Amino acid sequence: LRVVVQPCNKRVFMDAQYENAGATLSDDLTQCSVILGVKQVREDDLLPDRTYVFFSHVIKGQPENMSLLDTICKKNVRLIDYECITENGKRGDPRLIAFGIFAGNAGMINILRGLGERMLALGYSNPFLNVPSSYMHPSLNAARFSVRDAGEEISKGGIPQDFSPLTVVFTGNGNVSKGAQDIFSLLPHEMVSVEDLPHLPENQSKIYGCVVEAEDMLERLDSSKPFSTR
């Protein structure tokens, strides 16, 4: 089995490691019959009559990707979508491949860093400036220490008053949300309900968190029937 890997300097594994494992490094995939990726492929880059494996984001009928689905059909591409790989091979069964806890970890770390830079741009010094971006940390444990340090600064000196009460809202309780909540929990915080949001007191020494579920964002046209996501 010949394996071709496209060169990239953004992966956790170096190109040389793939070569040492027996892979061939090349940007040319025309000799490959099966092509694996993660995110959706640009339409112009799809090679005809191949099998592609990636997250296409079309299974729910996402309108922004219907053009991609049309191109897949026109180019006679066999699409294997990670999202459709389930425990028993049936739609609705538990998925076997999905973005996980680490995606939420990395995203929350980057959000804190971005929040710090935004506050600074508005003229406010703040504890989040001491949280480097995810890629700058040598390990997840190192990132946790950075977030804890920022949390200690919040406990002692608080966040800028103009941003209080600072609230982080998590949509849903999937893997990514749980990963984000995991990092958030390292800060001095209080979890509140959706009903509490309009009445939160100003408190500079902690951050509020709220998990928002589908029933908090949607309502049935017929209010006499109980809410259901199905």
Residue ranges and their predicted role:
Residues 25, 52, 79-81, 206-211:
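Conserved beta-strand scaffold positions in the cores of enzyme catalytic domains, especially
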Residues 18-23, 75-77, 203-207:
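A short helix-to-beta-strand connector/capping loop
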Residues 1-71:
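An N-terminal-biased, well-structured beta-alpha scaffold segment characteristic
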Residues 15, 34-37, 90-93, 218-222:
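Short, solvent-exposed polar/charged micro-motifs at secondary-structure junctions
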